[in-house]
Amino acid sequence: PSFALYEREGEPLALIGGRGYFSQSWPAGVDISEGVSRETAQRELGVQAPFMVGVLHTGLDIDPTRSPVQPKILLSRDVDYWACGHVHQPRLLPTSQCPRIAFSGCPQGRSVVETGPHGVYQVTLSQGSPVQADFLPMAQVEWCRLEVDVSECPTVADVQERIVSAQFAANADACCQRMVFRVILTGKTSLHSRLDARVLDDLRQAVNDSYPFFFIDDIWGCTSVPFNKEALRTEGLFPAAYLGALDEYRKGLSLIHISEPTRP
């Protein structure tokens, strides 16, 4: 590991120790955090300081393919705060109230798999007090997977209106103005057969042309056909026979009486 000293007004304030790597992987079975400790930092730098900060490129136990290390190992070290990189979503460990390990994530989501707010943590260390980590949103564009229930939409125009309403609702909870959406249409609807690839692409372009701050990269049609039992009963085909048999079976169950066993 490498070590550095952070000073304020000429006085030692924090020892910083860390390790990363330049290749695509870290040797299996080697603990990337080994040697990153207050004791080693003091020995290497020849000075003591109130705080010790560790910096690691690790997947912890979240991604076992990238220099994994168990969080309990880091928490057992005499290190006040671990700043970790690799996981692209913000995360605090062991709890948000006592965040001794933090992934800031990446400052900008890169694709639809990196949804939600992205930014950095502003961390405050105070002697005798828990670590304080405040999330600061930095992303200029936020990705969002948006499920839209269109079961009550009688027309394609209504579907478009429902999508726009859902976009604004999602934006109200976002940390920035511009958003990219992956829209998933759900619900049982009579429009199911009409929502083919061409119609979905026309919908996407129409919504994208309406609001410059929102962009839909794709719309997935995951709707289904409504199941009308009464209509099936009147058709006289196999579904009607099946439903009739099911009704008779349920009637038979209702006639069964199970009495309590007689105790001797």
List each language-model region with its residue ranges.
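His/Asp/Glu-rich metal-coordinating catalytic cores
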Residues: 1-124, 130
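Accessory, non-catalytic peripheral segments of nucleic-acid enzymes
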Residues: 130-255, 259, 263-264
